[in-house]
Amino acid sequence: IKRYYACHRKHSDIFELFLPQTTLRAQSLNHITALPFRAKDNSIVLIHRLGKFDPNVCSFEELMRLDFLIFETLLTNPVTQLCGITMICDLKEFSAEKWSEFTPSRIQSIFEIYARSLTLRIVAGHILNAPVIMNSLYNLSLNRLDPGLKEKLIFHPTGEWEELHSQIPPKILPEEYFGTLPSSGLVNLYDLINSNEDYFFELMRYGITPWS
């Protein structure tokens, strides 16, 4: 617990106002949703469309705050505590302007938060529609990645779905990934975190607060 709150204090630009109400601009991007069905290993499947990030709409820190609010909320489910999450990270439309927001120090912060603060187990991370520059950045970041996390990342060549479908059945994937699920069937996670504002106020009582 001490490590959890120490990490939050260190990255206060993300966690100082760790409340859903501070992420409304990021929520307007609608960049993260969940499948209505769990994967074969009972993990929740999240779709993170990083290409929807717009630095003219919200800051990098607000986007990360929203993501970690969602992860914290998912952890309140006992099944998810045990089985974790499977992440689909879609980099379609992720431009050079957006890449420029991911500075080495920010990337390092993300890795550190995952390693020292996030208790939600990541089962696998499927990277889709990655631009060429992503491979270069990934190779530069390899030595900073936690070995356990590194083993879980899978890069899928654009337009090739066989490996993704071998791990996540097409019947629970949306049509854009050559599945059969209508996009309208995806789960809105923002309603979930917005209804838990009191829960996050309680969390802040024990760690970093905007008045500390």
Annotate each language-model stretch with its function.
Residues I1-S212:
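Basic, amphipathic alpha-helical/coil surface patches used to engage anionic, phosphate-bearing ligands
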